[in-house]
């Protein structure tokens, strides 16, 4: 039956509160926290011919995992106040428009936006890039019910750049 102290219970290599397992330790000393928020999502299909001069939320319809069920409709909602590791990678493909003034990928939270910006014509001697991958990782301070999503912005240029299914957004509670 384990040992209980003020509702906290130690039983079968697990630390529990009520019937919720907070921490499990295996015979080698490895630990897992099954209720620790964590997610990884990707687009279900490519997002084609993005229109320049406007923010575009990235559609992430395929969840690889979602511990805690805090990711829905391409948005992560922090279940508790804490510091979260958030990661994104956007794969641009199919005739990336090097005539655009700039590309901006953004990890947007309720408290702050984190951006990566580049001029796609930084090397005039190359032809039109077919693929371009950019990543961004941050430790973000989030309060309970704050949200995070990823966005894309193309300044100028033509409607020709696509976002591929190799794009992803992931995160987990650190502290």
Language model: regions and residue ranges:
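Short, conserved secondary-structure segments in the cores of folded domains
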Residues: 21, 72-74, 138
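A short, structured loop/turn motif at beta-sheet edges
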Residues: 79-81, 107-114, 140-147
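Beta-strand-rich receptor-binding modules of extracellular spikes/adhesins
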Residues: 1-34, 156
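Short, surface-exposed tryptophan/glycine-enriched loops
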Residues: 126-147
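Acidic/polar, compositionally biased interaction segments
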Residues: 115-121, 134
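Terminal (often C-terminal
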Residues: 17, 27-99, 105, 109, ...
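Short beta-strand-plus-loop segments that form exposed binding edges in beta-rich domains
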Residues: 151-158
């Amino acid at each position: 039956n384990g040992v209980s102290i003020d509702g906290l219970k130690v039983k079968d290599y697990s630390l529990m509160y009520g019937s919720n397992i907070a921490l499990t330790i295996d015979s080698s000393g490895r630990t897992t926290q099954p209720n620790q928020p964590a997610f990884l999502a990707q687009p279900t299909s490519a997002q084609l011919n993005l229109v320049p001069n406007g923010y575009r939320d990235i559609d992430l319809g395929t969840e690889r995992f979602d511990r805690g069920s805090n990711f829905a409709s391409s948005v992560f909602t922090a279940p508790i106040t804490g510091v979260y590791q958030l990661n994104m990678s956007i794969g641009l493909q199919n005739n990336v428009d090097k005539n655009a003034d700039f590309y901006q990928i953004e990890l947007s939270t309720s408290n702050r936006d984190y951006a990566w910006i580049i001029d796609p014509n930084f090397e005039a001697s190359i032809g039109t890039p077919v693929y371009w991958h950019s990543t961004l990782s941050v430790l973000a301070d989030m309060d309970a019910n704050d949200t995070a999503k990823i966005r894309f912005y193309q300044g100028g240029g033509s409607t020709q750049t696509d976002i591929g299914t190799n794009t992803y957004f992931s995160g987990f509670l650190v502290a």
